[in-house]
């Protein structure tokens, strides 16, 4: 009962008191999605070296699979899972998304580039690479594109200059530009917000990731970047043999976002540096169940 009162008092997006159970269920479903990173072992491009490819996936098969198996229509594609950036492939992929009654929320661009490089040739090459991916995201009719502002130790000034150019290009394509706490110079949340503010706060948004900050500082760091979030990467990391998430309190992360007034979509994701033998469909079920319960 306390949660229902809280939502009513704060004008929370769910408005639990005012919605029927059916409408509330639809509302929470519209705010839950999933990326392709969790099933990286089933993609030829990202499976562990030397491992057998079992039950393979491609981006072309993801939209229907996610709708049928997980009842998920909000999608996020990882750049490493694209087979091509050719127009014919992208058009076919866009049609698969549409045919499944799905929608592409974000493209995570992790190609080889460094927008904070002090080497001007490298910075210009990186800008050209990023523009190619923005073109692809626009052709796919993605709702947004995530670009990394620069590697750890890079130049903040070069990153700002680059992100200004990237943002101008995104504006031409009518694409929101997202920056995630993703192991570059933006891992300092104050630097992250400085880059956003200097490069284009009207179109540049944060993409808070539950699992990327050190656990000791994650709550404070997430709280700083959450007010500027467009979507949230609802990441789980390590699980024990009983299928319990052991890295941090996943539900607390969602509740932190809700208390901060976040009204957007949570994109479920799992990533760990440990070699774990997991049933990733069950992990996906666990994350989606937690999100649907918490919203």
Q: Residue locations for each model-derived region?
A:
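N-terminal pre-domain/capping segments
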Residues: 2-134, 138-139, 171, 201, ...
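Acidic/histidine-rich catalytic cores of soluble enzymes
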Residues: 46, 74-75, 160, 164-256
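Active-site groove signature of glycoside hydrolases
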Residues: 136-155, 173-182
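Membrane-proximal, non-transmembrane interface segments of integral membrane proteins
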Residues: 94, 159-160
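A structural motif
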Residues: 71-72, 137, 142, 229, ...
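A short helix->loop->beta-strand "cap" motif at the edges of active sites that frequently abuts
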Residues: 102, 175, 260-264
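A cross-domain feature marking catalytic cores of carbohydrate-active enzymes
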Residues: 34-38, 77-81, 106-111, 147-149, ...
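Acidic-and-aromatic substrate-binding clefts and catalytic sites of carbohydrate-active enzymes
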Residues: 78-89, 114-117, 150-157, 182-189, ...
């Amino acid at each position: 009962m306390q949660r229902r009162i809280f939502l009513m008092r704060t004008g929370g997006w769910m408005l639990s008191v005012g919605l029927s159970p059916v409408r509330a269920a639809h509302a929470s479903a519209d705010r839950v999605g999933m990326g392709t990173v969790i099933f990286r072992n089933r993609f030829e491009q990202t499976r562990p070296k030397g491992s057998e490819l079992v039950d393979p996936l491609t981006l072309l098969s993801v939209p229907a699979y996610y709708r049928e198996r997980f009842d998920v229509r909000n999608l996020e594609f990882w750049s490493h899972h694209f087979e091509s950036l050719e127009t014919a492939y992208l058009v076919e992929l866009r049609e698969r998304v549409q045919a499944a009654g799905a929608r592409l929320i974000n493209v995570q661009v992790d190609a080889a580039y460094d927008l904070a490089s002090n080497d001007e040739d490298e910075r210009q090459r990186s800008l050209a690479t990023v523009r190619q991916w923005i073109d692809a995201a626009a052709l796919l009719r993605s709702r947004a594109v995530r670009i990394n502002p620069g590697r750890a130790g890079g130049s903040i000034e070069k990153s700002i200059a680059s992100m200004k150019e990237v943002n101008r290009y995104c504006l031409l394509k009518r694409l929101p530009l997202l920056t995630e706490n993703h192991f570059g110079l933006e891992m300092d949340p104050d630097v992250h917000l400085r880059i956003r503010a200097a490069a284009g706060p009207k179109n540049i948004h944060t993409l808070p990731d539950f699992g990327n900050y050190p656990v000791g500082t994650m709550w404070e760091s997430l709280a700083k970047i959450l007010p500027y979030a467009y979507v949230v990467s609802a990441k789980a990391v390590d699980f024990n043999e009983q299928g319990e998430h052991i890295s941090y309190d996943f539900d607390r992360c969602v509740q932190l976002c809700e208390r901060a007034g976040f009204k957007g979509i949570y994109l479920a994701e799992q990533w760990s540096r440990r070699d774990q033998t997991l049933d990733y469909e069950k992990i996906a079920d666990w994350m989606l169940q937690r999100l649907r319960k918490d919203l």
